[in-house]
């Protein structure tokens, strides 16, 4: 991707990460009816940040794939959620805080069921209030992914856009 989020070429993801090149990803924030955010604990088998708490679901956008389609696929693959409607929240620019990813943020709101994590991807997960996440970030930052901390520090995941 160039600095304006336009594709330049296709490369293996491992090489993109090694060279810290800009690329595309999605982040999905799943909210309960009470306005709590679902956090997932990444599987210990993950290459990056195993065993750390992360946002509800995320993934890389493959060449030729739409961000919304990637977000829906990640929800299904990681949390067994078959969603039809996601709300696009915003696009975060590629930066060190996003892992050099142009990140499309989506929200799935007012979920009235507990997600069922795919154990190959996610160890466990729970819904947390803004106050609980604030405490985790303040006291247990080392247990969280940099992505979760970065989103919190940019005003997500409990913004003023009314997701909850």
Regions found by a protein language model. Name each.
Residues 39, 56-89:
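The catalytic Nudix box helix
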Residues 51, 90, 97-164:
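Nudix hydrolase/Nudix homology domain
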């Amino acid at each position: 991707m160039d600095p304006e989020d336009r594709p330049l070429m296709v490369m293996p993801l491992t090489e993109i990460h090694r060279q810290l090149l800009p690329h595309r990803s999605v982040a999905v924030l799943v909210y309960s009816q009470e306005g709590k955010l679902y956090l997932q604990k990444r599987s210990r088998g993950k290459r990056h940040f195993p065993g750390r708490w992360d946002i509800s679901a995320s993934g890389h956008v493959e060449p030729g794939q739409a961000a919304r389609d990637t977000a829906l696929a990640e929800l299904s693959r990681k949390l067994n959620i078959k969603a039809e409607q996601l709300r696009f929240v915003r696009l975060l620019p590629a930066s060190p805080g996003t892992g050099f990813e142009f990140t499309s943020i989506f929200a799935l709101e007012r979920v009235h069921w507990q997600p069922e994590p795919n154990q190959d991807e996610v160890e466990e997960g729970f819904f947390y209030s803004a106050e609980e996440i604030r405490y985790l970030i303040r006291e247990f930052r080392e247990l969280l992914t940099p992505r979760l901390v970065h989103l919190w520090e940019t005003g997500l995941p409990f913004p003023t856009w009314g997701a909850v």
